[in-house]
Curated annotation (Swiss-Prot):
Component of the monoterpenoid indole alkaloids (MIAs, e.g. echitovenine, tabersonine, lochnericine, 19-hydroxytabersonine and horhammericine) biosynthetic pathway; MIAs are used in cancer treatment and other medical applications. Cytochrome P450 catalyzing the conversion of tabersonine to lochnericine. This is Tabersonine 6,7-epoxidase isoform 1. The lineage of its organism: Eukaryota, Viridiplantae, Streptophyta, Embryophyta, Tracheophyta. GO terms for cellular component: endoplasmic reticulum membrane. Mainly expressed in roots. Keywords: Alkaloid metabolism, Endoplasmic reticulum, Glycoprotein, Heme, Iron, Membrane, Metal-binding, Monooxygenase, Oxidoreductase, Transmembrane, Transmembrane helix. It catalyses: (-)-tabersonine + reduced [NADPH--hemoprotein reductase] + O2 = lochnericine + oxidized [NADPH--hemoprotein reductase] + H2O + H(+). The keyword Transit peptide does not apply. It comes from Catharanthus roseus. The keyword Signal does not apply.
Length: 506
């Protein structure tokens, strides 16, 4: 906190004249409508000092209770709108969706790693994004494409089960194993193979994730261009990203070489192959260079792995904390796959209670607790003026714990989803773990596929205990926020093979 305060003091002392001069040149806006209510602002830093008292989604929920579900903050020089209710979320994601269809720009780390916003997640709304969204829906992340990776998932999950089985009765770090599993599945889906080179890529991607959690003053004051270089962060990110780029460049060259000797019949397509074919065939009307391809592949790892990893980890932790939920989920999986000895994807649709466990996990622990947008133009919501180019933070975490929609919202209760029509596809605005509207996450099917099978296998093959005689209520569920909301501590558990498991014979 002292570091942040000192930086604020630096900003106040060095740039106050610049800010005054800049603001004096701004044209007057339409003042017929007021901005949404919000706390008082300090000169220069605005409300930035009020966001340092805990996790952002917790702090914003508490502020929303004071100032309402539609709130205005000034974060540095950024006009910021905070949404904390189902009703306002519907206004943002449905009624005024086109006005809120941009992603925040001028974010130092993301600008570098996305090759200047050439990816899916961060590209600005327009023709390129619409074409890219179509490619995602029809090619990259279509149900057929996700299904084509079934054998990759089944092989990878089975190998993890064997590894756990070899440590029967011993403490295993399940969090690390899940992370390695999801990264491995994504690497094989994207690149076709798994190698030491890809392990280095994943290590570098994790380092970028760490750097992305750094407090960046330049992001709060984008008009002051040299702040990014001042902290040294730009140099660190560019150095790591150069190594990432070298690896991706090598992967593209290798795929091009292999594709010259490959016919449709003698090899399956991975995601790099799909993107190279789109480029080669000129399927995009907008420019589609190697940088665009590399940005999209990086998206798959940065966005595609964390959501699934965190969901599996939280689900197992919640079941360990709630033994009755664990037993019911295990009984269901073992009944559906009775006599088979292993779990594949053929009957996952029959696991209704496990699906409810996953939905409840995403409700109480959304991987992305705050959904970020940026307004394309000024609009009006509930009689308030929403400025153009404003940052928008939709607090999905607070919305999914609203007692007006969720009885006993802080209790983990999968039964609430049994027989319920509420799902995570963006049409129920009280439940938006993947966002909603036209910028909803395009990889929902891919993410859920990587959650269901690992959980089903873990429940089927093993009985689970907490180490050291720990009681369920003693399990640490402390949350930390990096680029996603995850558990602070790794999940350490003791597996014991169940009699129904055939792992010893596999």
């Amino acid at each position: 906190m002292e570091f942040v305060v000192s930086l604020f003091a630096f900003v106040v002392s060095c740039f106050i004249l610049l800010k005054v001069a800049k603001n004096s040149k701004n044209p007057k806006r339409n003042t017929n409508l007021e901005l949404p209510p919000g706390p008082k602002q300090l000169p220069i830093i605005g409300n930035l000092h009020q966001l340092g008292g805990g996790l952002a989604h917790h702090v914003l929920r508490n502020l929303g209770k004071q100032y309402g579900p539609l709130m205005h903050l000034k974060i540095g020089e950024l006009s910021t709108i905070v949404v904390s209710s189902t009703e306002i979320a519907k206004e943002v994601f449905k009624t005024h969706d086109i006005h809120f269809s941009n992603r925040p720009s001028h974010i130092l780390v993301f600008k570098i790693v996305s090759y200047d916003y050439k990816d899916i997640v961060l590209s600005q709304y327009g023709k390129y994004w619409r074409e890219l969204r179509k490619v995602c829906n029809l090619e990259l992340l279509s149900p057929n494409r996700v299904q084509s990776f079934r054998s990759i998932r089944e092989d990878a999950v089975l190998n993890m089960m064997k590894s756990i089985s070899s440590n029967d009765g011993k403490v295993v770090n399940l969090s690390e194993m899940i992370l390695s599993l999801i990264y491995g599945i994504t690497a094989r889906a994207a690149f076709g193979v798994w190698s030491k080179k890809h392990e280095e890529f994943i290590r570098l991607e994790s380092e970028i994730q760490r750097l992305a959690t750094t407090f960046v003053l330049a992001d709060m004051f984008p008009s002051i261009k040299f702040l990014g270089a001042l902290s040294g962060l730009r140099y660190k990110v560019e150095k790591v990203h150069k190594k990432v780029d070298d690896i991706l460049e090598g992967i593209l060259k290798e795929h091009r070489r292999q594709n010259n000797n490959m016919t449709e019949e003698n090899g399956k397509k991975d995601l790099v192959d799909v993107l190279l074919n789109i480029q080669k065939n000129g399927d995009m009307e907008t420019p589609f260079t190697d940088q665009h391809i590399k940005a999209i592949i990086f998206d798959m790892f940065s966005a595609g792995t964390l959501t699934s990893t965190i969901a599996v980890d939280w689900a197992m932790a919640e079941m360990m904390k709630n033994p009755s939920v664990l037993k019911r989920a295990q009984d269901e999986v073992r009944n559906v796959y009775n006599g088979i000895g292993n779990v594949d994807e053929s009957k996952l649709d029959e696991l209704k209670y496990l699906q409810a466990v996953i939905k409840e996990t995403l409700r109480i622990h959304p991987g992305t607790p705050i959904v970020h947008r940026e307004t394309r133009e000024e609009c009006e919501i509930n009689g308030y003026r929403i400025p153009a180019k404003a940052r928008v933070m939709v607090n999905a975490w607070a919305i999914s714990r609203d007692p007006n929609y969720w009885p006993e919202p802080d209790i983990f209760k999968p039964e609430r989803f049994l027989g319920s029509e509420v799902d995570f596809k963006g049409t129920h605005f009280e439940y938006i773990p993947f966002g909603a509207g036209r910028r909803i996450c395009p990889g929902i099917s891919y993410a859920i596929a990587n959650v269901q099978l690992p959980l089903a296998q873990l429940l089927y093959h093993f009985e689970w205990k907490l180490p050291g005689g720990m009681k369920p209520e003693e399990l640490d569920m402390t949350e930390i926020l990096g680029t996603a909301a995850q558990r602070k501590e790794n999940l350490l558990l003791i597996p014991n093979s169940h009699s129904c498991s055939s792992l010893k014979q596999v």
